[in-house]
From Swiss-Prot:
Organism: Bombyx mori (Silk moth)
Keywords: Actin-binding, Cytoplasm, Cytoskeleton
This protein's name: Profilin
GO biological processes: regulation of cellular component organization
Keyword NADP: no
UniProt lineage: Eukaryota, Metazoa, Ecdysozoa, Arthropoda, Hexapoda
UniProt xrefs under Pfam families: Profilin
InterPro entries in alphabetical order: PFN, PFN_euk, PFN_sf, Profilin_CS
Length: 126
């Protein structure tokens, strides 16, 4: 499967996320859903935020030009929200899966889909 297939067939087809991307730790976007304009700098800040949570607690999580309020996270998960739109990101060994979801999708639904793909990528060495 190509990276675009993972975005289209695993994330978007689930209907549990409304926009999604997979990128490298260097910020380069490998694949993204149609109309999802996330920048290399935004991805790089998300990746840095996994290591240094204070970057996100003070500056929020910016995706496609919109700043979301950081809610919680770990060394491999980031959760954020702004209004009716939520963010769920997962870091793997070489990649980061970034997703947006909108109500009525529940945070747990998006988390399940994103983390299932993330765990699979980890088992594949990514």
């Amino acid at each position: 499967m190509s990276w675009q297939d993972y975005v289209d067939k695993q994330l978007m087809a689930s209907r549990c996320v409304t926009k999604a991307a997979i990128a490298g730790h260097d910020g380069n976007v490998w694949a993204k859903s149609e109309g999802f304009e996330i920048s290399k700098d935004e991805v790089a800040k998300i990746v840095a935020g996994f290591e240094n949570e204070s970057l996100l607690t003070s500056g929020g999580v910016t995706i496609a030009g919109t700043r979301y309020i950081y809610l919680s996270g770990t060394d491999h998960i980031i959760r954020a929200k702004l209004g009716k739109v939520g963010v769920h990101c997962m870091k793997t060994q070489q990649a980061v899966v970034i997703s947006l979801y909108e109500e009525p999708i529940q945070p747990q639904q998006a988390a399940s889909v994103v983390e299932k793909l993330g765990e699979y990528l980890i088992t594949c060495g990514y």
